[in-house]
Amino acid sequence: MLPEQSAFGRSAMPGSDAVNPGPSPFAPPPNSFSGDFLGLSLPDEEHLWGMSPLSSSMPSWNGKNEQMFSNPNLERDLKHSHVRNGQPTPPPYGDNKTHTVGDLYSLSQCQFSNGAQNFQTHNDRRSFCEQSAINSNGGSSKRRKVRDAKMTQAEYNEQQQEKAKREKFLERNRLAASKCRQKKKEHTQLLESRYREQSDKKEQLVSEIARLRSEILGLKNEVLKHAQCGDEPIKLHLAQMVKKITYNDTTAPDLTDVPDAASSSEGPMTPRPQQALSFGFDDPLHLEPSRADGSTDHSVRRDSEASVLTENSYAFSTDESFDDLINV
């Protein structure tokens, strides 16, 4: 192999990254290659580098061009370049290391893995957003549930307070009603006891009235037994009783015609002072006005009383109308 060919091989293939089968953009113009280089072929290196045979119009290679293509900066740029869609691309920023052919595949795998990782990161971010939205919705629903629970608790507490107030109000009403019933029962029992007492007292009074009437009747019978004794007060009392009986018999029809006459202060009730005088025959003061009239009047009265106290008058006093004498 000629020195030009080796120099061209070094300059044409600066690194393992230039795998593009097309013409390199860093190749010299066609008129810069020598004529004796056209007949050379690189069959052993074509399968490695993927280079097509050089055209016949390429001129001969000179050392000046070799020095130009042997620039280490260009080799470094070519080593760090990437070929995409048939065009070399600049290396990643901050990459100062040289790469081999195996590094290209690892770099492509790394780029693919980075893309997959970015896609996975995007999916994770989206799932995180969805999870955040779900959590926010769940949190809002939880807050709503908590708020509803608080409202329900407040309503329950309010209902319990109202129920307690209602129970207290009903308890007071029941207590007041119980006291009222107890008081009414005690009042009823008091009235019943007073009724029994008054009934017993009434029975006692009725029995006392009956006893007194029987006693009055016995006393009047004793007075009638002494009617023939000649005692002036007894004779006067009997005469007044006879007058009252006869007066009641004569005024009975008038009283039936005029029922209000008994309730009036004037009328047949005028003889009551005489009744008082008749029961006061033991008192000599009631007889003094009659004695002041004179001896003649007194003698006439005695004669009239003697005429009244006959057997006929005594028989009249002992008939069925004698019950009226009891009430005199």
Swiss-Prot record:
InterPro entries hit by this protein: bZIP (IPR004827), bZIP_sf (IPR046347), bZIP_transcription_factors (IPR051027)
Span list, region Basic motif: 163-202
Biased segments, Polar residues type: 262-277
Region (Leucine-zipper): 205-219
GO cellular component, one term: nucleus
GO BP terms: regulation of transcription by RNA polymerase II
UniProt note: phenotype after gene disruption: Increases sensitivity to osmotic and oxidative stresses, but also to cell wall-damaging agents such as Congo red or iprodione. Shows increased resistance to low caspofungin concentrations, but is more sensitive to higher caspofungin concentrations. Leads to attenuated virulence.
Compartment(s) of residence: Nucleus
Chain intervals with Pro residues compositional bias: 22-31
Region (Disordered): 1-39, 250-313
Compositionally biased spans, kind Basic and acidic residues: 283-305
Induction: Expression is induced in during osmotic stress and repressed in the absence of the mitogen-activated protein kinase sakA. Expression is also highly induced at low and high caspofungin concentrations.
Keywords: DNA-binding, Nucleus, Stress response, Transcription, Transcription regulation
Listed PANTHER family: CYCLIC-AMP RESPONSE ELEMENT BINDING PROTEIN
Sequence similarity: Belongs to the bZIP family. ATF subfamily.
Protein name: Basic leucine zipper (bZIP) transcription factor atfB
Native source organism of the sequence: Aspergillus fumigatus (strain ATCC MYA-4609 / CBS 101355 / FGSC A1100 / Af293) (Neosartorya fumigata)
The gene coding this protein: atfB
